[in-house]
């Protein structure tokens, strides 16, 4: 069961984590030249986009937010691209391949966080912020302490994601392309730095859009071919899958993936609220011109993601029929070649031949590049905008801020490559769960309460936010994944895999208590400023739009 839960954490979109789609032993595959050629075409095309974008990046606004000129539809595709990761594509289809109906329940769980973003966050975030979520949290609170906390929360999440991403990139490429792990990690790191350094948000947005379109096309074709095989009948699809799956009719029974209600609730809360606290997702709402376009972004993103997760369900059941029952895709021991996470890739070969297999492999690699570019830009903006320009050197010019941002991109890229190599054989699945827990326990409570609770003060936000962050990290370390599986202790001090239920509670209680007991003059002034903030958040008066953003 622990392995199943680890696999669950591994499919966080988070994620956007190819690392999580590849769990267990990795068997290097023969060199796939079709995949390599198609991937090189993608790289050349996206580098051309980066060159085009670099000619249009003239200011801080252009670099961080593409000048605020991305449409709601385009931004929705880009946001969906962040979520439609290699982990989602390979991991969830593998989950359906092994567990059946439970895979659909889990994949749809990713969508639960989006109504929160749509109804509670998107409009006010766009009306109050400029470049990062810290702009919103610090709107009426003390700039220095709040920006330091927000930047730390963002950087920890970005660092955890990047490490897991780089390890996953190496493993995934070893599986799909037959290339050396270290070459793959360096290649991803270099391309990531080029996209962000020269093209900024404009380049990363269009890379995400192109990747999302390619992935939706590939997944749609696979699902179409599977349904064609069964006469476009879901009844035939499920019947044939049950007939060949080792579990038989049990693959249609839900409830076998989480061991107890506390774990289920904690995992669900982490996914739901963590989504609303991911820095690279929140940053995308500043790329549109106004709150209306921000709402449209979430609407389109939710539609694309919902469609995609339905496709992965069909792909998973198709893999049961066409891959699981075909000895051509099994090794001598009867296991799927490359592991269960290769189910969707083998299905691509089964329905479209070697050429389509190369296409799907190249798209899977492209998903990694697109997501790491977004993560890197989010981390760089936290350092250059939140820390450098608003804490350490107030009044810095745009040119100085952009220089710091680009230096940070280089540093993050080099660190990501080094750590990707060092963590090659380490268990990094816990990093995804920890990233979501921190986003849900530190970033989300402060952003939400700063926009909705008039009695919030800097003291409450600081103490509650740090308590949430520290609680998430400590409980994750004391839990079964790190304390037992990595550190080798016999029994975990904290019995649950996911800390979000407890760390989120600590954060909200801490923020409420320390704000409610803050009787300082500064606290009173911050409460009085809420009315002006509320008017701005509702009307958008004073918000910068379009080219002036």
Curated annotation (Swiss-Prot):
Q: Where in the cell is it found?
A: Cell inner membrane
Coiled-coil intervals: none
What Gene3D superfamilies does the database record attribute to this sequence? Sodium/glucose cotransporter
Principal subcellular localisation of the protein: membrane
PROSITE patterns (UniProt xref): NA_SOLUT_SYMP_1 (PS00456), NA_SOLUT_SYMP_2 (PS00457), NA_SOLUT_SYMP_3 (PS50283)
Q: Give UniProt keywords alphabetically.
A: Cell inner membrane, Cell membrane, Ion transport, Membrane, Sodium, Sodium transport, Symport, Transmembrane, Transmembrane helix, Transport
* Membrane topology label: Multi-pass membrane protein
* Record-annotated membrane-spanning stretches: 33-55, 76-98, 103-125, 146-168, 183-205, 212-234, 261-283, 303-325, 350-372, 402-424, 428-450, 462-484, 494-516
Any one Gene Ontology cellular component term annotated for this protein: plasma membrane
Tell me the GO molecular function terms: acetate transmembrane transporter activity; glycolate transmembrane transporter activity; symporter activity
Per the UniProt topology annotation, the Cytoplasmic ranges are 56-75, 126-145, 206-211, 284-302, 373-401, 451-461, 517-549
Keyword Methyltransferase among UniProt keywords: no
- Topological domains, Periplasmic: 1-32, 99-102, 169-182, 235-260, 326-349, 425-427, 485-493
Its Gene Ontology biological processes? plasma membrane acetate transport; sodium ion transport
General function of this protein: Transports acetate.
Q: Which family does it belong to?
A: Belongs to the sodium:solute symporter (SSF) (TC 2.A.21) family.
State what protein this is by name.
Cation/acetate symporter ActP
* The organism of origin for this protein: Shigella flexneri
């Amino acid at each position: 069961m622990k392995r199943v839960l680890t696999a669950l954490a591994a499919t966080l979109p988070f994620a956007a984590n190819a690392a999580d789609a590849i769990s267990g032993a990795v068997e290097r595959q023969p060199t796939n030249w079709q995949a390599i050629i198609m991937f090189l075409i993608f790289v050349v095309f996206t580098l051309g986009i980066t060159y085009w974008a670099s000619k249009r990046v003239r200011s801080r606004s252009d670099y961080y937010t593409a000048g605020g000129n991305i449409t709601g539809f385009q931004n929705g595709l880009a946001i969906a691209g962040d979520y439609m990761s290699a982990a989602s594509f390979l991991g969830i289809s593998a989950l359906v391949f092994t567990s059946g109906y439970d895979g659909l329940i889990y994949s749809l769980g990713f969508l639960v966080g989006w109504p929160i973003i749509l109804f509670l966050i998107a409009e006010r975030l766009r009306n109050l912020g400029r470049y990062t979520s810290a702009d919103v949290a610090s709107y009426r609170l003390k700039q220095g302490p709040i920006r330091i906390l927000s930047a730390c929360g963002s950087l920890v999440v970005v660092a955890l994601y990047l490490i897991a991403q780089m390890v996953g990139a190496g493993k995934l490429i070893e599986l799909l392309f037959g290339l050396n792990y270290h070459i793959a990690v360096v290649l991803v790191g270099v391309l990531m730095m080029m996209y962000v350094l020269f093209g900024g948000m404009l380049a990363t947005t269009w890379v995400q859009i192109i990747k999302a379109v390619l992935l939706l096309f590939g997944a749609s074709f696979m699902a179409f071919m599977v349904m064609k095989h069964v006469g476009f009948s879901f009844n035939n699809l499920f019947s044939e899958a049950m007939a060949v799956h080792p579990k038989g009719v049990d693959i249609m029974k839900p409830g076998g993936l989480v061991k107890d209600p506390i774990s289920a609730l904690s995992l669900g809360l982490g996914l739901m609220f963590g989504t609303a606290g991911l820095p690279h997702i929140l940053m995308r709402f500043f790329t549109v011109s106004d709150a209306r376009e921000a709402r449209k972004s979430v609407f389109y993103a939710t539609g694309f993601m919902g469609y995609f997760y339905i496709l992965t369900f069909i792909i998973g059941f198709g893999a049961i029929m066409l891959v699981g029952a075909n000895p051509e895709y099994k090794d001598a021991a009867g296991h799927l070649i490359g592991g269960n996470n290769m189910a969707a890739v083998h299905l691509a070969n089964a329905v479209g031949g070697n050429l389509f297999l190369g296409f799907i492999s190249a798209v899977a690699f492209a998903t990694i590049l697109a997501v790491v570019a977004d993560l890197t830009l989010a981390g760089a903006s936290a350092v250059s905008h939140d820390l450098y320009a608003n804490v350490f050197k107030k009044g810095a010019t745009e040119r100085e801020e952009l220089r710091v941002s680009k230096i940070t991109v280089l540093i993050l890229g080099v660190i990501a490559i080094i750590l990707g190599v060092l963590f090659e054989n380490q268990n990094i699945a816990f990093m995804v769960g920890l990233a979501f827990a921190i986003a849900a326990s530190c970033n989300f409570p402060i952003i939400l309460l700063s926009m909705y609770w008039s009695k919030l003060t800097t003291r409450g936000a600081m103490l509650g936010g740090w308590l949430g962050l520290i609680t998430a990290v400590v409980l994750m370390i004391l839990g079964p994944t790190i304390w037992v599986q990595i550190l080798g202790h016999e029994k975990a001090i904290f019995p649950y895999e996911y800390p979000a239920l407890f760390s989120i509670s600590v954060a909200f209680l801490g923020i409420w208590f320390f704000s409610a007991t803050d009787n300082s003059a500064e606290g009173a002034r911050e409460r009085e400023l809420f009315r002006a903030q509320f008017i701005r958040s509702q009307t958008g008066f004073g918000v910068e739009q379009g080219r002036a953003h």
